[in-house]
Every structure is written in structure tokens, then in C-alpha cells.
């Protein structure tokens, strides 16, 4: 609902969704098993043209899949400059 609503609002040459970055995630992949190894994360919006949508990025089996690296990436896209967040010291390059 919220993504459709933001996409319906014009903001200059883009929509409000194009200029927004929303993240939704869960702290469990499979709640019945309490599996927190593969967390489902959805990032919606274009961040003012700073992120490319329409992709699935799968970090299964990759050591660089720290969630805090995603947060660093998102902060970087919003011009919030920091070198660390939680246990992460660099953003995810693919975001």
C-alpha cells in the first residue's frame, strides 16, 4: 500500500517513491526454526536515482552479507557519511 501511494505522488519529474528509500526486513528467515542466517530484506524506492531497482541480490554463502553493511550502504545513498555501523566497516558494493 505505502509504495503504491508514494508512487502516485508526483514530485518534480519523479514520484515520491523515486525519491524515497524504504527498507522492510525480518529478524528471522524461518520463524519456526529461529533461523537468522538468511534475513529477508526488501528495499523499495529509488533514493533520488541513487539505487537501481528491479533486482534481487542474493548473499547466501557470502561472507560479506552483514546486515550492518546494508545500513552503511543506505546511509551512504542518503549522504550520511560514516565509516562504521555496528560490526560493518564498509558498505555493500552492489546496493
Spans of model-derived segments:
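Feature marks hydrolase-like catalytic cores characterized by long aromatic- and Gly/Pro-rich stretches
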Residues: 1-95
Amino acid at each position: 500500500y505505502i509504495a503504491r501511494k508514494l508512487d502516485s505522488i508526483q514530485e518534480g519529474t519523479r514520484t515520491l517513491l523515486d525519491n524515497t528509500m524504504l527498507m522492510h526486513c525480518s529478524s528471522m528467515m524461518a520463524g519456526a526454526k529461529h533461523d537468522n542466517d538468511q534475513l529477508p530484506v526488501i528495499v523499495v524506492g529509488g533514493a533520488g536515482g541513487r539505487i537501481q531497482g528491479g533486482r534481487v541480490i542474493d548473499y547466501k554463502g557470502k561472507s560479506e552479507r552483514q546486515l550492518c553493511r546494508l545500513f552503511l550502504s543506505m546511509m551512504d545513498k542518503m549522504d550520511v557519511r560514516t565509516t562504521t555501523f555496528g560490526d560493518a566497516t564498509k558498505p555493500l558494493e552492489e546496493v
